[in-house]
């Protein structure tokens, strides 16, 4: 009789991979912030995520009424312009979570062999990201899914800028119902504040931040006390990372 331990190890992926795929699809298809936050809370409280050190940050854009306006390619460059009618943006740092509604706007996705640029522009939110990665070929087709590991990133919104050489994963999912999910997972942050009087140990992060009026919170999301109402997304990430 064959070794049962070897058999278990051999057939384990047949159970784990489909289960993981179903969980991801269920997460992206569900529009209720409560389920999203419950899932993130479960992940963030697992032993693997509870170790000491910088927090893992999740940013999720759930957009609907998406249509592709423009798409063109060059030998070493690809750009796609999308329009959307509305959506939401959710984020979680450690065990803290927040959800904001978004009005209609535009998305620009630019991709080269080493850098991917993502810009989301609407009346209630403007965010721009640049992700540095190794050679990666994006196949931007309708109803396509891709996940791209990155080595460093730059983010900016109307009040904040952040540079970080901490890596993570960017994923984009387009679905049959004219919806799109964009998720950014960042594996930790270490922050230098420019107003520190002491000379800090050199770290690869710099930012500036101011305050502005908040967006409207999603109706189905709680009103948590750990996020002040006049913080921007990057400001929240930076503050929680600094306090980690």
From Swiss-Prot:
Q: Which GO terms describe its cellular component?
A: host cell nucleus
Localization recorded for this chain is: Host nucleus
**Region Disordered, annotated ranges:** 193-227
Polar residues bias: start-end ranges: 205-220
- Spell out the Pfam families in the cross-references: Herpes_UL4
Principal location listed in the UniProt entry: host cell
| InterPro entries linked to this entry | Herpes_UL4
What keywords tag this UniProt record?
Host nucleus
Family membership noted in the UniProt record? Belongs to the alphaherpesvirinae HHV-1 UL4 family.
List the protein's name. Answer: Nuclear protein UL4 homolog
Q: Which organism is it from?
A: Varicella-zoster virus (strain Dumas) (HHV-3)
């Amino acid at each position: 009789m064959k070794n049962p331990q070897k058999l278990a190890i051999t057939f384990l992926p047949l159970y784990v991979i489909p289960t993981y795929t179903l969980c991801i699809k269920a997460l992206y298809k569900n529009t209720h912030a409560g389920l999203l936050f419950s899932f993130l809370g479960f992940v963030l409280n697992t032993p693997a995520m509870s170790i000491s050190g910088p927090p893992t940050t999740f940013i999720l854009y759930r957009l609907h009424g998406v249509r592709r306006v423009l798409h063109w390619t060059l030998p070493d460059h690809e750009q796609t312009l999308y329009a959307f009618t509305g959506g939401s943006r959710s984020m979680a740092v450690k065990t803290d979570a927040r959800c904001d509604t978004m009005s209609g706007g535009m998305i620009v996705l630019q991709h080269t062999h080493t850098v991917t640029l993502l810009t989301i522009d609407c009346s209630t939110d403007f965010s721009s990201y640049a992700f540095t990665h190794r050679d990666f070929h994006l196949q931007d087709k309708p109803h396509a899914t891709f996940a791209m590991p990155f080595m460093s990133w730059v983010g900016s919104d109307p009040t904040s800028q952040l540079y970080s050489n901490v890596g993570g994963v960017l994923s984009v999912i387009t679905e049959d119902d004219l919806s799109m999910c964009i998720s950014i997972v960042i594996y930790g942050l270490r922050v230098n504040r420019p107003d520190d009087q002491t000379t800090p140990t050199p770290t690869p992060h710099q930012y500036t931040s101011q305050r502005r009026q908040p967006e409207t919170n999603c109706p189905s999301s709680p009103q948590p006390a750990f996020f002040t109402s006049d913080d921007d997304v990057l400001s929240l990430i930076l503050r929680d990372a600094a306090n980690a």
